[in-house]
Amino acid sequence: ERNPHYVRLSDPGHAHKHTGLDNEGFFGIGVKKGEEYRFSVWARLPQGSTKETLRIELVDTQSMGERQALVAGNLTIDSKDWKKYQMILKPGSTHPKSVLRIFLTSKGTVDLEHVSLFPVDTWKGHENGLRKDLAQALADIHPGVFRFPGGCIVEGTDLETRYDWKKSVGPVENRPLNENRWQYTFTHRFFPDYYQSYGLGFYEYFLLSEEMGAAPLPILNCGLSCQYQNNDPKAHVAVCDLDNYIQDALDLIEFANGDVNTKWGKVRADMGHPAPFN
């Protein structure tokens, strides 16, 4: 319900051709020889077939050699219901700008949702974890306070696109996509592909704070959208209508510190942290 969109791959009807997707990450996906990367995807068979095959590759799109693939493998999709499929990719060479390629090699139809590629070796070994070198560099500073997720990003371009902490917790595959605050800020340069997945959410921020030994300082929206882009007072929430925003703050306290029998304390516990973050 919170994340209803998916992509459908079907046989194109042309011999020796396949339907697929490329994802270049942020100007390329850096991978290292011999390191393991966990690929996962939620998939289903919508049209009655019992088995379809996906080809998963990390490729060097600039290569003029006979093979572009740094590593490749097949996934068998075998369920009409949404199901998580995983595989480990281990590149045979290092490349700073690889591309993740997914294509359907069989003749049926497959629906895909929540495609993910993560290093296996993350900070503290968390599956939905942080890049190890960056998190370690942050921890080495020994911060006393860790403020998250930021300032302007909490406001959103408008209230509809504000950062909502409740959408950033729970199973990562159920967290909805949101526009990034700076997607259309500068009229001379739009960033139409600038989104945030909420894959890094308040649970992950609290966990990072705890593991670094820093006091967490969560920032919440108080009913204001970006004042730089919204001069009309009606773009913001009137004082008499702030109840929902106040409740969000109270619920966050419960999420961080509440007993596992409370609504939001249970969400935290179900994510793997029954003890309060305190």
Task: Kindly label every feature range from the protein language model.
Residues 1-2, 98, 129-133, 199-205, ...:
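Alpha-helical scaffolding within the catalytic cores
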Residues 1-197, 215-217, 232-243:
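Extracellular and organelle-lumenal recognition/adhesion modules and their flexible linkers in secreted
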Residues 28-32, 137, 207-208, 212, ...:
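Surface-exposed acidic, glycine-flexible loop patches that form ligand/cofactor-binding
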Residues 47-48, 64-66, 93-95, 211-212, ...:
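Secondary-structure transition/capping motifs at alpha-helix termini
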Residues 103-105, 113-114, 119, 149-152, ...:
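Active-site groove signature of glycoside hydrolases
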Residues 198, 202-207, 211-213, 220-259, ...:
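Catalytic-domain carbohydrate-binding cleft regions of carbohydrate-active enzymes
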